[in-house]
Amino acid sequence: MAEMADIKPTDDILEPSAGRGAIVVALRKYRFRSLTMFELSRENYAVLSGLKLGTALFGDFLKEDCGGFKFDKIVMNPPFSRSQDCDHVTHAYSMLRTPGLLVAIMSEGVFFRETAKARIFRALNPWSECLPEGTFKSSGTMVRSRLVRLEK
């Protein structure tokens, strides 16, 4: 995922649903200008802050616009329940610079559901690749998912 993001030393990066930092830890081997991470769980936020890999912000990413700041790259694994992945990715896309690149893990459902939010997401013309069944079994989930790439 981090490799697909093609991170450059001049990039400002956003991880809007950072959890305990699995994705941002994978970014350690890359050079970039800045990294901003959002987390809604106070416990996870404390873990992120301790990583000292960038700016960890506590709060609901969906209610943020970062003061209009735009990011070159966005890497994310948003929550899937109740189509939250659509909400998170669509909102993150609005914070992407032009040109910019967003790479996300999303549920399979967004690619076949006929809800308004799924249709809005698909209108962004994402590239996607199905991940092997059981990819996240060690994390306690068997949800079918895809690796998604959106360019602006």
Positions of PLM-derived features:
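Class I S-adenosyl-L-methionine-dependent methyltransferase catalytic core
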Residues: 1-152
